[in-house]
Amino acid sequence: MSGHTNNTENIALNGAQHSQAEAWYIEVLKLEQQGFAQTEQEAQARVDLLVNASNQDFAPASTLLGQWHVLGRYLNQSIPSAILFFQHAAKLNHGLAHLELAYLGLNHASDQLTQAQALMHLQQAVQLNHPEAIFVYAQQQLAQDPQAAYQLLLDNYLKNQHQNSLKFCVEFSGFDPIKVQNELLKIAEKDHFACALLAFSYFTQHNLDAAFKYAEIAQQHNDPFGCYVRALVEQQRDQGDATLAQEFLLKAAKNGHIESAYLAAVNLLKNAENAKTEQKHQEYATLAVELLSHAAVAGHVPAQYSLAQCLRYGLGTEKNLDQGVSWLERAAMQNHPDAQFELSMLLPLEHEHHLPLLNAAADKGHTQAMLCMSIFEQRQDNAQGALYWLNKAKELQVPRAFFLLGQMYREGKCVDVDLSLSADLFKQAADHGDIDSYFELFKIYKDGIGVRKNKKTASKYLDLAKENQHIEAASIEF
């Protein structure tokens, strides 16, 4: 009898502890929705609440701590620590924790997890009916059995309302588009998101009339994606109204569509730039920052970068360099090339992360990063590296790349001197509007460096340099 009583008391105690742990976890989620912690004390308070909840075996808290360790959010970035928290939550049958372990293993983020272990965790998450895990698993099955993958995705939407699964069915070119569209038509009769997707499908086929019809139905029922597609349709219509399109983006954002929040913010920043009064400028910019903050917290990487810029330069908000750099770091960690480049420029040249960030941005096609990498390679006397980056930039028609190559071949930096090629490169740079090249070509044609002397051509380039306020050219009479 007493044993039964003790067991009942233990169950009640465990239930109370679990309820308290859940309350701590929910409090953290509410704080996160309000924005990034402003001070170290606020950040530590959020971490402490999660740790307390995790210690009481509340799996979602353990999983969130693991995610923060992966991102370096309030905690030191540490994959081993993240794995420990994920494993703790996985033992408590938390589907998301299994999925996070699968991600780490499949992406080779840690030697602690083999591919086989990653797949096992993915299957565990699928068995726990985690919608995102089913989505990932279905994508893995595409090569082996596309029909089975399609059915998994379709069922994942019909049973779990996993919107990305249905969206993938529309976007993946390997599925029969007619079959997918017929399925959408059936679902759309009673489903506003399917209606929105059908509109998007028609939009990608340039059938604006059909896209308008279904997007209008979806937006009338306040479907966020439907409002977004309705905005896209309005932008593409022959007599589309930009103001109306912005209203649909704002409506989509209000209903939780993150991409719309970002796009609406971009439009507002443009409006702020062109505003005729300071009051309107502040009004547009402030609303833009609110939308960017919402999208950034939700993980939208371009929004994180844009928010960083607003905070760094005090646009629509008080200037806050620390927060700005923090958002810049988050965007850079998620491979945003502009963020990687700007973060590298903020770091001293000797900093261990300066060159890797610069290199990563250049690899993604960031033209300024390419030029900086070429200069770095020149300083290292690495002709092959310097030429590689300049030629990559030249392929993208970057004027400065032609100019720097012209300098290299004129001065014999890392390459043999070739005055004729140098003159041709300066000419190409000038054709692309490079002001310094106008002045270089003036000297080239004046003195006959790699070309025949030509006073008329020299005078033409000197005039172009002067028209573009080239300092040295301004004082020359020719």
Regions found by a protein language model. Name each.
Residues 27-34, 64-71, 101-108, 136-143, ...:
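Hydrophobic face of amphipathic alpha-helices that form TPR/SEL1-like repeat modules
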Residues 17-20, 34-35, 56-58, 71-73, ...:
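Short helix-capping/linker turns of helical repeat alpha-solenoids
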Residues 22-41, 52, 56, 200-201:
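Alpha-helical segment of the N-proximal tetratricopeptide repeat
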Residues 73, 77, 113, 144-145, ...:
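Residue-level detector of the short coil/turn that links helix A to helix B
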Residues 154-159, 453-470:
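TPR/TPR-like (Sel1-like) alpha-helical repeat modules
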Residues 23, 61, 97, 133, ...:
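TPR alpha-solenoid repeat register
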